[in-house]
Every structure is written in structure tokens, then in C-alpha cells.
Amino acid sequence: MLRPQGFRNYMVGKWHVTPLTQSGPAGPYDGWPLGRGFDRFYGFMDAETDQYAPELVRDNTPCDPPGRFADGYHLTSDLIDQSIRFIADHSADRPDIPWLTWVALGACHAPHQAPQDIIMSYDAAFAHGWEASQEAGQEGSQDPGQEPGEPDGDVEARLRPVTP
């Protein structure tokens, strides 16, 4: 859609548009990003991938991630780096041509994996166990003066006109 208007189009991240039977290294490639109007692609073809050891594709070619878990690699940082690289390359090569960079990060999808230091930062919050943490969260979410288990009239009133 933008290519006929003179745009260069770059896509980074989750594609998940091509059927699994057509997303392997042998193609066919017409449903891949380059076959759908993008000039460059770096990311993964399926709905999800390991955030530390992803199955990546550069343009139409499978490629290894540029780092490893042991070295601090995480897919989100890699995708941002590749986005910046596409934009920098475009600016150096074709600064007068408009461009689109579509970034679809994968960390919001399964598998949900966080860096170990972030996981460990929550240890104190859950030191008393999951149930105690859940109860504390529920208590903090209620209006002052509302009894546990008492319905929230304001929410019910707002939802009443909603028809499923």
C-alpha cells in the first residue's frame, strides 16, 4: 500500500500472518514480509518464539540470533537494535525517501520470559507466598469502606448497558 506512494517499508518482529505450512525455510515466500510489500524483514514467522533463543529470519533467510542467553541476549533488545539499524541504513542510503518501520515485539506473547534480575526483584513481594500476595493485592484494589465480597456498584452500573 505504501510502496506505490514511494515509501521504503521495513518490518521487525512477529510476523504470524503466513500459515505454518508455508513459513518454513523452503517457503513459498509470497506470504512472507518481502512478498507482502516490505523491503527488509528481521524477526520470527510464527506466533511465538523463545525470547533467549529465537528462530529468526532476515529477509527470506533463516539466521541465528546475534547473542546467547549466557551473554545477556534478549529478543526485545535485538529487535530494537535491528529497527535502529534499518532506519540508520535508510537515512544513510535514501534520506529523501519516506519510510515506514513496523515493529511487532514478541515479549508480550508466550512464552513469557523475563530477565533473571527482573524476576529476582519481585522475590521480596512474594516472600510470604502466592496466596498472601494475592490477598494483599485484592485488599488494595477495593474502595475504602467496601466489605470483602461486596459488589462494586459503580462498576455494575457501568456494565449494565453492555450486552454480550
Regions found by a protein language model. Name each.
Residues 1-164:
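Formylglycine-dependent sulfatase
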